[in-house]
């Protein structure tokens, strides 16, 4: 069953795949509310890029 047909499942997938931050220095994935990178302790974080089709 495709996930795109069920809006509840789609919301769960979108949350887990796109709601996090990426460190610009080491590329580590961090929680969406992070202020510092868990790996290198840098404050240079960006939200995960997402293009909607």
Swiss-Prot record:
* Domain of life assignment: Archaea
GO cellular component terms listed in the entry, alphabetical order: ribonucleoprotein complex; ribosome
Q: Which UniProt keywords apply?
A: Ribonucleoprotein, Ribosomal protein
Q: Establish whether keyword Ribonucleoprotein is in the entry.
A: yes
UniProt GO molecular function: structural constituent of ribosome
Q: Might you name a Gene Ontology BP term for this protein?
A: translation
Q: Which Gene3D superfamilies does the entry mention?
A: 4.10.1060.50
- Into which family does the record put it? Belongs to the eukaryotic ribosomal protein eL40 family.
Q: Which HAMAP family match?
A: Ribosomal_eL40 (MF_00788)
Q: From the Swiss-Prot or TrEMBL record, give the protein name.
A: Large ribosomal subunit protein eL40
Gene of this entry: rpl40e
């Amino acid at each position: 069953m495709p996930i795109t047909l069920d809006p509840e499942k789609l919301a769960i997938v979108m949350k887990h795949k796109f709601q996090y931050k990426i460190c610009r220095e080491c590329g580590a994935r961090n929680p969406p509310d992070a202020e510092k990178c868990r790996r290198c302790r840098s404050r240079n974080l960006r939200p995960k890029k997402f293009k909607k089709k």
